[in-house]
Amino acid sequence: MAKKVAICTLLYSRDYLPGALTLAYQLQKLLKHAVVEDEITLCLLIEKKLFGDEFKPQEIALIRSLFKEIIIIEPLKDQEKSIEKNKANLELLKRPELSHTLLKARLWELVQFDQVLFLDADTLPLNKEFFEILRLYPEQTRFQIAAVPDIGWPDMFNTGVLLLIPDLDMATSLQDFLIKTVSIDGADQGIFNQFFNPICNYSKEVLHKVSPLMEWIRLPFTYNVTMPNYGYQSSPAMNFFQQHIRLIHFIGTFKPWSRNTTDYDDHYYQLWRSTQRELYSECHLSNYFTHLQLGNIETETNFYHEPPCLQDLLNHGKRENQKHVDLDITSVDRNASQKSTAEKHDIEKPTSKPQSAFKFDWESTDYLDRVQRAFPKPDT
């Protein structure tokens, strides 16, 4: 019997928008050629404030075209207190933005689905065989979480790829546990291991809070190959298993869409960028997205490519006959009062103005029409 399966990612910061869009595009491509018996729904989980306040209508249109369902989520109960409590451990990672990954605890609330496959926005499935993951454990229970061992500490699992059974009681138990417990790493990976992974339950105080039925099912590493691995990676193993790798996970501060990633310019980073270029070219988004100001995560990272030469962009705009672009960049009217497409979706109009050197016609339907033609809404 076919299951209802959600393949989800979480967007907790606009810095990860390039990753989420590229991931959804790649999943759509692979699903067209995969033999999948289940009913698949691509879902984006996103905080209400982030979706309503920080995304422009063009971005919302593209998100809606790539994901069948956009699930607006509220902050967790006492989320700010939990973040503050976990601050010290999170500082050891030097990744303050990961505090919001605790929102993954909302995944167990998706009870409209029989199973949830969660993928971090900085992952890239490589082939249609990736979807075999859905057939590995047909008898999985709500007490079990399937994940790949973390390369930094293999007795713990990495939360970049998770297979789980939604359940409201489990969601409540996990979120209560999250409030009362300090995470090993200050983020989702630590707390999920403390909840599901018996190896992490050394403390009697922790043991009485979780069920003895909790279990971590170990997935093959090929379903979540992390990189860069800073000396941990086995080159012979990579060579031997290369044809069987199902998904690459770009961990750490620098992402394939980061400005300065020349040190990691290997095959898989190039593959991610090639997929991104394919996505943007299909609906002529180069002019817009190369000028997106995504802001910085609270590190030294700038999370987007250097914009191409302005003249190249102007020439490209002329070739594509993009009527929504105002080439007179010296006279951009930032105070133009124009109707936001977001109003059609009951989303509050963004207060920030586009930072691009180009001015977009917010009333024009040409942009939205091209997006819809390039990415028709998925049927499954």
From Swiss-Prot:
Keywords: Cytoplasm, Glycogen biosynthesis, Glycoprotein, Manganese, Metal-binding, Transferase, Vacuole. Changing Y232F: Eliminates glycogen accumulation. Glycans are attached at Y230, Y232, Y367. GO terms for biological process: glycogen biosynthetic process. InterPro entries: Glyco_trans_8 (IPR002495), GNT1/Glycosyltrans_8 (IPR050587), Nucleotide-diphossugar_trans (IPR029044). Disruption phenotype: Simultaneous knockout of GLG1 abolishes glycogen biosynthesis. UDP binds at L10, Y16, R95, D120, A121, D122, H249, G252, K255. GO terms for molecular function: glycogenin glucosyltransferase activity; glycosyltransferase activity; metal ion binding. The record marks K104 as: Important for catalytic activity. Its cofactor is Mn(2+). UDP-alpha-D-glucose binds at L10, Y16, R95, K104, D120, A121, D122, N158, T159, D185, D188, Q189, G252, K255. Changing Y230F: Eliminates glycogen accumulation. Its main location: cytoplasm. Self-glucosylating initiator of glycogen synthesis. It catalyzes the formation of a short alpha (1,4)-glucosyl chain covalently attached via a glucose 1-O-tyrosyl linkage to internal tyrosine residues and these chains act as primers for the elongation reaction catalyzed by glycogen synthase. Capable of transferring glucosyl residues to unbound acceptors such as free oligoglucans or oligoglucan derivatives. Interacts with glycogen synthase GSY2. PANTHER family: GLYCOGENIN SUBFAMILY MEMBER (PTHR11183). This is Glycogenin-2. It comes from Saccharomyces cerevisiae (strain ATCC 204508 / S288c). The lineage of its organism: Eukaryota, Fungi, Dikarya, Ascomycota, Saccharomycotina.
